[in-house]
Amino acid sequence: MVSVPTAWCSVALALLVALHEGKDQAAATLEQPASSPRARAAHLRLRRCSCSSWLDKECVYFCHLDIIWVNTPGQTAPYGLGNPPRRRRRSLPGRCECSSARDPACATFCHQRSRADAVGVPGSQSSADAFQAGKTWATPGELLRTLRDISAAKTHFAKRQQEATREPRTTHSRHRKR
């Protein structure tokens, strides 16, 4: 009869041998594609087109085919985009530039107006939508005035909250202590 520790040792040894053999097979399959000079280069992400702004999330989602999108509380952020040269981004005339001129869906998407511009009425967009569409403030001082107004409103609200907590609460006559 075989003792229990001996049985466990033989099972563990068989498992290690099987894992070691599987490791050799996996390494052989990984070496085959790496032997070509093109595969040794850095991983290039598949792109249908190049967006002129990373803030245009609809364009980034359309153009970059293998992006992993990470959900964060404030926004959905693309993971693994990399950082292309700024000169190329600035030189793009429209929303994006297609990598293949024979792609009609890409040409239609890149040369049409953005959805926010097509649907919205001028002046009805939120500041976030206007920022995503690439628009700037009408006057240089408008942003500063808006921030000052927000700050004043927050200060006023904080003062009112403090005054409300300082006022003594009136209790009902039946609940007063004698």
UniProtKB/Swiss-Prot annotation:
Single GO term (MF): hormone activity
SMART domains tied to this protein: END
Propeptide residue interval(s): 25-46, 70-178
Localization per Swiss-Prot or TrEMBL: Secreted
Ranges annotated as biased composition (Basic and acidic residues): 160-170
GO cellular component labels: extracellular space
Swiss-Prot/TrEMBL keywords: Cleavage on pair of basic residues, Disulfide bond, Secreted, Signal, Vasoactive, Vasoconstrictor
Region (Endothelin-like): 96-111
Region described as Disordered: 154-178
Matches recorded under PROSITE patterns: ENDOTHELIN
Pfam families: Endothelin
Family annotation (InterPro entries): Endothelin, Endothelin_toxin_CS, Endothln-like_toxin
GO biological process annotation, one example: vein smooth muscle contraction
Function: Endothelins are endothelium-derived vasoconstrictor peptides.
Family per record: Belongs to the endothelin/sarafotoxin family.
Protein name: Endothelin-2
Organism: Oryctolagus cuniculus
